[in-house]
């Protein structure tokens, strides 16, 4: 048998992170950290989201936040403080470690994910926000006639 288990990969990823709890994440976000929701649309539709979070689905995260990528977002910068969250805090740990691999040394994740945020009584919303890719390609509404 070759390779490592997902549990081993997750444990290794987390050794590199200083994971933030919900209240620490909220304070960091208020201080300018980028809060990034990487959950798929079905989870966001069912459970809601966090006001002010940027929605970047997991499959394009590295391309949007790598400062060297042609498809990067304007916010992408090596000094950017990024807090990634998923539903329960597993996928977000892997994603934050991947961002660190790209050189975003301030990347981390929300310990416990959206579930922990909501349980802490922090603000949430129930509407489904577009991803950064959808927002960039959605034409503005037509003016009323």
Model regions and ranges:
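Rhodanese-like catalytic fold shared by cysteine-dependent sulfurtransferases
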Residues: 1-34, 41-81, 90-145
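Short, surface-exposed ligand- or partner-binding patches at beta-edge/loop junctions that are enriched
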Residues: 85-86
